[in-house]
Amino acid sequence: MTSQQAHAIPDVQNLNDSRKLAIDKVGIKSIRHPVRVSDKNGGVQHTIAVFNMYVGLPHNFKGTHMSRFIEIINGNEREISVESIEPMLREMVKRLEAETGQIELTFPYFINKSAPISGVQSLMDYEVTFTAEIREGGAYTFTMKTVVPVTSLCPCSKKISEYGAHNQRSHVTVTAQTNSFLWIEELVQLVESQASCQLYGLLKRPDEKYVTEHAYDNPKFVEDMVRDVAGLLNAEARIDCYRVESENFESIHNHSAYALIECDKRLVVGAN
């Protein structure tokens, strides 16, 4: 196809739209691409992220150019790093002639953990989502979301039972908008410190005894979990606003217990 023939193909997306309704987000979802993420120990993890990429569409455009999203994600390097997200986002907004844009990437992240007694090491995986956003006026924000699996033990069950107490695996999800760099490991450790007990990939018998007894000594309702985590998030100056959720997959019910706290510390008098 000659360049003259290419120019003759109609560009429907650039046509005016008579409905005059702007679209908040339009783009592509669920595209997989390699990424590399630096870890706190000085290493680099190579993993696969699922990307969502959106821009705001002005009311006068009929559609956006979907192929440009793919060009942008493949344009600069084979692997995308955390450091390259903001430049990529700004390029996306510019090329698509938008005022707002958002890139989300979700990936598994691994932390090497030592069992509490034997010291045997194993990997634990955590689901992490980075969200980079440009809002009207060009303001840039970065949000990190981490799902941390932990153990919770019911205080009521412990109180009313002659022996034992029901416990279960729980997911504590923290979504934090940051004003400066925060390691994934720091957010994970913050959450795990407030659980009845943290989880490990590998445990020997002395370790299993320890985690069972540790959970029994630290019973927590789902309400306790979000309040205790929120207290530490309030004290973390690098976090401007957050959402903390806890879902307990109840071992004696066929439903989950759930609690949530949201806070924009910039609006709270006396906050850091």
UniProtKB/Swiss-Prot annotation:
<comment type="similarity">
    <text>Belongs to the GTP cyclohydrolase IV family.</text>
</comment>
<dbReference type="GO" id="GO:0046654">
    <property type="term" value="P:tetrahydrofolate biosynthetic process"/>
</dbReference>
<dbReference type="InterPro" id="IPR003801">
    <property type="entry name" value="GTP_cyclohydrolase_FolE2/MptA"/>
</dbReference>
<keyword id="KW-0378">Hydrolase</keyword>
<comment type="pathway">
    <text>Cofactor biosynthesis; 7,8-dihydroneopterin triphosphate biosynthesis; 7,8-dihydroneopterin triphosphate from GTP: step 1/1.</text>
</comment>
<protein>
    <recommendedName>
        <fullName>GTP cyclohydrolase FolE2</fullName>
        <ecNumber>3.5.4.16</ecNumber>
    </recommendedName>
</protein>
<dbReference type="Pfam" id="PF02649">
    <property type="entry name" value="GCHY-1"/>
</dbReference>
<dbReference type="InterPro" id="IPR022838">
    <property type="entry name" value="GTP_cyclohydrolase_FolE2"/>
</dbReference>
<comment type="function">
    <text>Converts GTP to 7,8-dihydroneopterin triphosphate.</text>
</comment>
<feature type="site" description="May be catalytically important">
    <location>
        <position position="154"/>
    </location>
</feature>
<dbReference type="GO" id="GO:0003934">
    <property type="term" value="F:GTP cyclohydrolase I activity"/>
</dbReference>
